[in-house]
Amino acid sequence: MTASRRTLMVMAGGTGGHVFPGLAVAHRMEAAGWRVVWLGNPAGMEATLVPKHGIPMEYVRFGGLRGKGLKTKLALPFNLLRACAQSLAALRRVRPDVVLGMGGYITFPAGVMTALSGRPLVLHEQNSIAGLANKVLAKLAKRVLVAFPGALPHAEWTGNPIRAELARTEPPKARYAARSGPLNVLVVGGSLGAAALNEVVPRALALLAPGERPRVVHQAGAKHIDALKANYEAAGFAAGDDVRLVPFIDDMAAAYAAADLVICRSGAMTVSEIAAVGVAALFVPFPYAVDDHQTTNAAFLADAGAAVLVQQRDLSAELLADWLRGQSRASLAAMAERSRSLAKPEATDEVARVCATVAGANLESLQ
C-alpha cells in the first residue's frame, strides 16, 4: 500500500493546546501524501478551526464532568455509551491505518474504541502531568509520546509538535548579540488574557526609573485591551512611552524572536514554543490549572536555569521591578541559550514518523 492511500485519524479537541499540535502533525502527514481525517466535538473550537485547514471532520459528542451539575454527572453512563458508538461508527467510515490521540475529552471514548476495534493507537501527552484519560489510554496504545520527560511511564520524549516557523528561528546567540539599547519585553496574556499580568506589569514598570525601563509589547487578550490601557494610564504611561498594547498577535514566531524576555503563563504549548525559539522567560503559572500542571510545565525550563518561575500569589509590582533591574541582555541571552538546548524542534516530524511506523509505512515518505 502506498503512502497516498494511507489514512491518519487525528482525535483532538477542546483547547488550542490539543488542536494546534494536532494540526502541525496533520499538515506534515498531508505533505507526505497521507489522507487525514479529524475526529472532534461539534461544540469544540476544532469544529470551526480544523475545516479552515481543509481537513474533513467526523464528530463525537462528549464532555467532561469538572464543574458540572448533578444532572450531567448522572447522565455520564449514557453519554459515554453514545460517544463510544459514535466513535466506532466514525472509525468504520474512515477506516484509518493509525489513530493519533492528542487530547481533549473525546479522546477517551474514541481511544478506547480504537483499541477495541483493533486499530493502532498512538497517544501524545502535551502537558508535564498526564490526565486520567491518557493514563488509562496509555495502557491501550501502541506507542506513547510525551512533550515533557516523565509525564507517563515508559513513554518516548518527542516534545510538542509546533508550527514550522518557530523551529526555523535564528539561534538566540546571534539574535541577542545584534541588539543594543533597552531590553525588549513581550508580555503575553494569551487569547483570554491574564488579569494578574495585566495588573502587575504596568505598576512594575512605573517603579523603574526611565533609564531602566524596557521596551514593552503587551498582548492583552481581545476582551481585556481597554482595561489594560486603563492600567497603563493609571501607572502614568501615555501612548508612545515605549509601550505597545495589542489585543492579539498574528505572528508569534516574530514576536518571540524580537524579545529579550517573555513574561507569560506556562501552558504546554507556550513553554514548548519559547524553548523552540530560544528566548528568556518569566513564567507565572495559571494557579487554577488542573493538577497545577502549568507549574510543572514551567519547572522543566526553570529547573535548568532556562527560565524563572514566579507563582501568582508571590507576584507583585515590587518583586517584578526588582527582578527586572537585575537583568542584562547578556544574562537573558544565557537563559535563552539554555532554553533552546532543551527544545525538541523536530517534534512534528518525530510524531509523524511514529504514526507512519505504527501503520507499517515506509519512512522515506516522511523525509
Curated annotation (Swiss-Prot):
<keyword id="KW-0573">Peptidoglycan synthesis</keyword>
<feature type="binding site">
    <location>
        <position position="127"/>
    </location>
    <ligand>
        <name>UDP-N-acetyl-alpha-D-glucosamine</name>
    </ligand>
</feature>
<dbReference type="GO" id="GO:0071555">
    <property type="term" value="P:cell wall organization"/>
</dbReference>
<feature type="binding site">
    <location>
        <begin position="15"/>
        <end position="17"/>
    </location>
    <ligand>
        <name>UDP-N-acetyl-alpha-D-glucosamine</name>
    </ligand>
</feature>
<dbReference type="Pfam" id="PF04101">
    <property type="entry name" value="Glyco_tran_28_C"/>
</dbReference>
<feature type="binding site">
    <location>
        <position position="249"/>
    </location>
    <ligand>
        <name>UDP-N-acetyl-alpha-D-glucosamine</name>
    </ligand>
</feature>
<dbReference type="GO" id="GO:0008360">
    <property type="term" value="P:regulation of cell shape"/>
</dbReference>
<dbReference type="InterPro" id="IPR004276">
    <property type="entry name" value="GlycoTrans_28_N"/>
</dbReference>
<dbReference type="GO" id="GO:0050511">
    <property type="term" value="F:undecaprenyldiphospho-muramoylpentapeptide beta-N-acetylglucosaminyltransferase activity"/>
</dbReference>
<feature type="binding site">
    <location>
        <position position="191"/>
    </location>
    <ligand>
        <name>UDP-N-acetyl-alpha-D-glucosamine</name>
    </ligand>
</feature>
<keyword id="KW-0961">Cell wall biogenesis/degradation</keyword>
<dbReference type="Pfam" id="PF03033">
    <property type="entry name" value="Glyco_transf_28"/>
</dbReference>
<comment type="pathway">
    <text>Cell wall biogenesis; peptidoglycan biosynthesis.</text>
</comment>
<protein>
    <recommendedName>
        <fullName>UDP-N-acetylglucosamine--N-acetylmuramyl-(pentapeptide) pyrophosphoryl-undecaprenol N-acetylglucosamine transferase</fullName>
        <ecNumber>2.4.1.227</ecNumber>
    </recommendedName>
</protein>
<dbReference type="GO" id="GO:0030259">
    <property type="term" value="P:lipid glycosylation"/>
</dbReference>
<feature type="binding site">
    <location>
        <position position="294"/>
    </location>
    <ligand>
        <name>UDP-N-acetyl-alpha-D-glucosamine</name>
    </ligand>
</feature>
<keyword id="KW-0472">Membrane</keyword>
<dbReference type="InterPro" id="IPR007235">
    <property type="entry name" value="Glyco_trans_28_C"/>
</dbReference>
<keyword id="KW-1003">Cell membrane</keyword>
<dbReference type="GO" id="GO:0051301">
    <property type="term" value="P:cell division"/>
</dbReference>
<dbReference type="GO" id="GO:0005975">
    <property type="term" value="P:carbohydrate metabolic process"/>
</dbReference>
<dbReference type="GO" id="GO:0051991">
    <property type="term" value="F:UDP-N-acetyl-D-glucosamine:N-acetylmuramoyl-L-alanyl-D-glutamyl-meso-2,6-diaminopimelyl-D-alanyl-D-alanine-diphosphoundecaprenol 4-beta-N-acetylglucosaminlytransferase activity"/>
</dbReference>
<keyword id="KW-0997">Cell inner membrane</keyword>
<feature type="binding site">
    <location>
        <position position="163"/>
    </location>
    <ligand>
        <name>UDP-N-acetyl-alpha-D-glucosamine</name>
    </ligand>
</feature>
<keyword id="KW-0132">Cell division</keyword>
<dbReference type="GO" id="GO:0005886">
    <property type="term" value="C:plasma membrane"/>
</dbReference>
<comment type="similarity">
    <text>Belongs to the glycosyltransferase 28 family. MurG subfamily.</text>
</comment>
<keyword id="KW-0808">Transferase</keyword>
<keyword id="KW-0133">Cell shape</keyword>
<keyword id="KW-0131">Cell cycle</keyword>
<dbReference type="InterPro" id="IPR006009">
    <property type="entry name" value="GlcNAc_MurG"/>
</dbReference>
<dbReference type="GO" id="GO:0009252">
    <property type="term" value="P:peptidoglycan biosynthetic process"/>
</dbReference>
<comment type="function">
    <text>Cell wall formation. Catalyzes the transfer of a GlcNAc subunit on undecaprenyl-pyrophosphoryl-MurNAc-pentapeptide (lipid intermediate I) to form undecaprenyl-pyrophosphoryl-MurNAc-(pentapeptide)GlcNAc (lipid intermediate II).</text>
</comment>
<keyword id="KW-0328">Glycosyltransferase</keyword>
